[in-house]
Design a protein with these regions (language model features):
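Acidic/polar low-complexity segments and flexible, solvent-exposed patches
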Residues: 1-142
Length: 142
């Protein structure tokens, strides 16, 4: 009986040791926090108000920073990366404010999506890519 318990404990220990490098690699992510250019649709202290604004603009997200909720319609490392999204918002008569803000984001995905956004002129593709950028790239999104 003691021999079986010892074998089981050894197997668990070996498994744990072998799993540590894999776990530490998965914990490393490509998140960065730095100044980004954003198209802000509103800033709210109340989540319900921010949710209402988000619902009025397809593809927008709510970004929480401490106790403040930002409704964002676009994000890019470069100001020129927002040009196509700005055109769409203007065409739809949606008010926005362009500014810089510090955002926690997934650096790997942001580069990929910004390149795709720059290469397309199709409005539906631009809206879809922008929505993916906001949802997959921006951390702290609600």
């Amino acid at each position: 009986m003691k021999k079986k318990i010892l074998i089981i404990l050894m197997a668990i220990a070996v498994g744990a040791i072998l799993a540590l490098p894999t776990l530490s690699m998965s914990l490393k992510d490509s998140s960065k926090k730095e100044n980004m250019f954003v198209l802000q649709l509103g800033i709210f202290k109340n989540y319900d108000n921010s949710f209402e604004k988000k619902q009025s603009v397809k593809g927008s997200i709510i970004y929480q920073n401490k106790d403040v909720y930002y409704v964002l319609a676009g994000v890019s490392k470069e100001e020129t990366g927002l040009y196509k999204i700005e055109e769409y918002l203007k065409k739809e008569n949606i008010s926005y404010y362009k500014k810089q803000m510090t955002i926690c984001y997934d650096a790997d995905n942001l580069v990929k999506y910004n390149l795709l956004l720059q290469k397309t002129n199709d409005e539906e593709t631009i809206k879809t890519l922008n929505e993916k950028v906001l949802k997959e790239v921006v951390k702290n999104e609600l």
